[in-house]
């Protein structure tokens, strides 16, 4: 049984819930009003609620099948809720187009963080602006595909 079998609880912020619905209906073919043309849906499990939460994010990937998710929240003073969820349960599901897969999650620092941060800024240049506008250290998580078990 996967923790992602839990019930889905849409975001209480209507624009996010609508973006998730748009992505799932079109497999990401329609651009996002929030995160642009190249986007993904991150699934986490609520640390307190135990329900599935879904968040539209900028697509940041490498050639090895790994992804990064950046907890910028537009440079807000606090981390997005999904950061707390990933720290509590370092497991994610990610929808990229029509494909949905599970990933192991690692919060990265040092060289790994720098490499992902550079890649992220190539896709979405506002990340440096977000970091400059907040006193918090914006977290970066690497998502590595989970091994498929028979």
Role assignments for model-derived ranges:
Residues 1-35:
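Extreme N-terminal tail/first-helix region
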Residues 3-5, 72-127, 133-137, 145:
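Short, structured beta-strand-loop surface elements
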Residues 35-38, 131-135:
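Short coil/turn segments at secondary-structure boundaries
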Residues 36-74:
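Short beta-strand segments
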Residues 40, 139-141:
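Short beta-strand micro-motifs in enzyme catalytic cores
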Residues 62-64, 99, 148:
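Short strand-connecting beta-turns/loops that link adjacent beta-strands
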Residues 143-149:
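Short beta-strand-to-coil "C-cap" segments at the C-terminal boundary of structured domains/repeats
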């Amino acid at each position: 049984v996967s923790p992602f079998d839990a019930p889905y609880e849409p975001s209480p912020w209507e624009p996010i819930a609508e973006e998730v619905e748009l992505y799932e209906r079109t497999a990401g073919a329609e651009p996002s009003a929030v995160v642009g043309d190249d986007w993904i849906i991150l699934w986490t499990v609520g640390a307190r609620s135990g329900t599935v939460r879904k968040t539209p994010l900028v697509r940041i990937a490498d050639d090895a099948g790994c992804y990064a998710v950046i907890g910028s929240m537009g440079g807000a003073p606090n981390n997005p809720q999904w950061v707390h969820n990933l720290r509590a349960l370092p497991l994610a599901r990610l929808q990229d187009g029509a494909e949905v897969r599970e990933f192991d999650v690692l919060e990265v620092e040092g060289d790994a963080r720098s490499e992902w941060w550079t890649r992220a800024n190539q896709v979405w240049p506002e990340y440096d602006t977000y970091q400059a506008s907040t006193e918090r250290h914006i977290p970066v998580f690497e998502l590595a595909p989970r091994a498929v078990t028979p």
